């Protein structure tokens, strides 16, 4: 699947800033990953290091698990390359600033893997996703996230 640079340049800084603010309000010290092509951020809280990947989704607004319109949450397969490093995968809704999170060891299971042809928003071609039942995700309402 084609990487959409314009979307990345707009949404990556926003996602990192929102997630950083959220984590800092919860007592984490947050740092950018010095590896530009690695997992986005890491945080330290109570001497525990946690890794965070963040993505911003556009066009399908949600605020809670109940109004999330699908039974599963779709996670990009290209992030599987980091599966040996346990990390939290955070998706932020652009329209509402709600967020959802799931741990990588839950996401990247073969039973959730799905291939699909995509043709939208500058993306065209076959891509692989991991579709995780939303009950395995943590949903954070906008009032608690921003």
Please tell me what each predicted stretch does.
Residues 1-35:
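Acidic-basic catalytic patches of nuclease active cores, encompassing PD-(D/E)XK
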Residues 20, 79-80:
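Short amphipathic alpha-helical segments and helix-helix/interface helices
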Residues 23, 41-62:
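Conserved catalytic cores of phosphodiester-cleaving nucleases, focusing on short active-site segments
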Residues 25, 95-146:
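Non-catalytic C-terminal interaction segments of nucleic acid-processing enzymes
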Residues 35-39, 96-98:
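Short acidic/glycine-enriched loop/turn segments that link adjacent beta-strands
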Residues 36-38, 49-53, 83-87:
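Short connector loops at helix/strand junctions that flank enzyme active sites
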Residues 55-77:
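Short beta-strand-loop-alpha-helix junction that forms the active-site gateway
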Residues 84-89, 96-98:
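Short, surface-exposed beta-edge/turn micro-motifs
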């Amino acid at each position: 699947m084609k990487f959409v640079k314009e979307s990345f340049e707009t949404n990556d800084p926003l996602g990192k800033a929102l997630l950083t603010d959220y984590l800092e309000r919860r007592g984490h010290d947050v740092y950018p990953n010095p590896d530009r092509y690695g997992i986005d951020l890491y945080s330290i809280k109570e001497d525990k290091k946690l890794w965070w990947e963040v993505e911003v989704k556009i066009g399908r607004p949600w605020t809670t698990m109940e109004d999330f319109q699908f039974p599963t949450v779709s996670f990009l397969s290209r992030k599987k390359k980091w599966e040996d490093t346990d990390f939290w995968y955070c998706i932020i809704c652009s329209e509402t600033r709600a967020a959802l999170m799931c741990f990588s060891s839950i996401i990247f299971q073969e039973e959730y893997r799905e291939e699909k042809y995509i043709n939208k928003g500058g993306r065209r071609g076959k891509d692989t996703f991991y579709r995780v039942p939303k009950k395995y995700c943590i949903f954070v309402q906008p009032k608690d996230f921003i």
